[in-house]
Amino acid sequence: MQNRKWLILFAPGLLMLLSLVIAARQLKTSSPALPWDPVATFSILGYDPATGEIGAAVQSRVFSVGNGVLWAEAGVGAVATQAIVDVSYGPQGMALLKQGVSPKDIIKRILDADPDPRPRDWTKKGRQFAVIDAKGEVAAYTGPEATKYAGDKQGKYCTAQGNILAGEAVVANMVKAFEETKGHLSMRLMAALDAGQAAGGDTRGMQSANILIVGKGMGVWLNNDVVLRLQVDDSPEPLKEMRRLVEAWNERRAKNQQRPVG
């Protein structure tokens, strides 16, 4: 008898709770899953007015982050594409740079032209990209739906941007490190990546990194504008390995500069 009274008393509440659980499950299953992992990362674009070199660097908790994030051409500029990424932003940005369009206008033009074909699960509001031209002018865009923390910060001849970060300090520290570090552009980009990681970096961890530097006729051998291209695709400590490679390259560069010509 007491069990029946208990059932009568609490049955409405139990039914309501059950209906809420079922509704929540239906909502979860009806929400579209992302077709690909967002390129959650932090990157920096930089320019050295003393040499004319343009560089880009990136680190992320995805495999082979350099495959589709960084774009650069000597005497033209560089682009970084990430977050809910549309990789075509890279070549689009480079084409507009060649036409003499400013980085700020490039950002606007590309966003305006984006058809946003998958607004529910791959929206352009989640995109993040940055542009630097051959004079060091920069601009960046962080969409309101890029996974938090997401943001960008511009400095003198540089722009840093990232998403799924520990906080604003990641990009702020990257800019500070780039501006304050002496030496070749590769060392300044490397310092920026290290500073970003020291501030918390990508909250999911580390896996891959990439550095790309271009300069007109400044690469090794004939007719080569690629000064440096380094990629760590899969490592528990990609920045440690990247720094080793950058320092090894700078040692070799210093030795080559000491060789007599002719």
Which residue ranges define each predicted feature?
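N-terminal nucleophile
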Residues: 27-262
